[in-house]
Amino acid sequence: MSHQPKPLSEVEHIKTQSRLLRGSLAESLEDPVTGGLATPDTNLIKFHGSYQQDDRDVREERRQQKLEPDYSFMLRTRLPGGVCTPAQWLVMDALAREHANHTLRITTRQAFQLHGVIKDDLRPTIARINEAMMDTLAACGDVNRNVLCNPNPVDSRVHETVYQWAVRISEHLLPKTRAYYEVWLGKEKVAGGEDEPIYGATYLPRKFKAAVAVPPLNDVDVFAQDLGFIAIIEGDALVGFNVSVGGGMGATHGDAATYPRLADVVGFIPPEQTLAVAEEVVKIHRDFGDRTNRKHARLKYVLEERGVPWFTAELEKRLGFPLQPARPFAFEHNGDRFGWTEGHDGRWHLTLHLDSGRVADRPGAPHLTGLREIARIHTGDFRLTANQNLVIAGVTPEARDAIGALVTAHALDSFRSASPVRRNALACVALPTCGLAMAEAERYLPTFVGRLEDRLRAHGLQDANLLLRITGCPNGCARPYLAEVGLVGKAPGRYNLHLGGDARGQRLSHLYRENIDEDAILAALEPLFEGYARERQPGEGFGDFVVRAGHVPSPAVQPRPS
């Protein structure tokens, strides 16, 4: 009996016919009849760094009025390692006020997002981003996304070297099509000879995420990435990277064939082999990823189903050289270090806490204005963290008092007073703009944290470094499956409760309760907090406790898909 191959997903056909990501984007942008794009172009624009969205708070009202959805666009920058200059910050600040919803958002991939950009403003907004020596190319889509890197230059000069490798990886894996420059920047079409040497005409089966980590901090959650480079430092020198492959957070409710997965460390390489390894890992995803089912298309499923030994052998065959054995390393924490720290060169770095990465002017908290004023006098740079916070980096000793005064005057000093659970918490955007959200996340986080703080305080745990993450759907943009307490949206006001991750980003959590509301979540946590307060060992985190006490399975017995 012959087996017919499964049909390709619809997006694969769109990419095939797109002429290297051009599609009919130019025509869609000029169409005055609608605030949206032609359906195929809504997929293609992701590669250019944007998502078409609509305001779900008014979707039903507009439907009843026989109006099209209230379309707008989210724009995301490509900003390797999250480093930007004060001048670039001021450009993003101006665009947020002129063309977006008067807010900036720092993402869990160290990038800026603008929300609420209307179709007619897309071209001028993208043009100004490019004029500021940034871009949005490959910030979304079936390509390598923004490359993460430890954002804080405190520890050593090696951190700057590692950051430069993150930039080189990002540039090396950038799509080569001229479509972006033609559609958005008015560049002339070049006749013939265009190809995609790494991606091919249909790019990857799904998104690809890469990160560079510098132990002992795992602030980029390297094991949640498709590809990770873990810096190995001996003395004051970078000697190479351990390579990790096959991580990913996304899953689908009710589909056992989809699941979060931690990456596997497959070996060690010297720095000069970094770009070759990055390219060949991407090509393996290109050639073996599932193009028939986008929910099953990430690289992690290739490793899970074919096995790590197969993957390593395939990678070494393509490279033409073997990987060396992985070298020892240790992670201590995956959070940020708040407040002032002095760097190796005598300059100072101030890490600010931002709720869910949102920079806005709110009553009593004019953060957007405050950071604008800081950018006008700052001579160092800004570093966006993968925990949605911000480092004002490279502050001279002479400027420290002035920067500190602006921070205080604009209520940017919450890192001093916020509880550890509030400082460490992450949330995705979710409603009202994300089309995938099943429940609230960013808008709900402050309320839930407040109630959680009350329960922790009742048990004397107000200083516990609890790691909480909330996402509005199971795709896991805020990496909830690595949290000690993770809420994953299931329906309006209802979440799956995951417990048992750790504060090092090295252990997946376990589903503890399914489809429950806030009261039930707090009721489920109450006896665990009581036990943790009574029985925890010195230095033991909450996630470690719930595993040790048997409330959730340990990783050794946690079921894995077969």
From Swiss-Prot:
One of its GO terms (cellular component) is sulfite reductase complex (NADPH). Its EC number is 1.8.1.2. One of its GO terms (molecular function) is heme binding. Siroheme binds at C477. PROSITE patterns: NIR_SIR. One of its GO terms (biological process) is cysteine biosynthetic process. It is an enzyme of class 1 (oxidoreductase). Pathway: Sulfur metabolism; hydrogen sulfide biosynthesis; hydrogen sulfide from sulfite (NADPH route): step 1/1. Signal peptide: none annotated. NCBIfam families: CysI, PRK13504.1. This is Sulfite reductase [NADPH] hemoprotein beta-component. It comes from Myxococcus xanthus (strain DK1622).
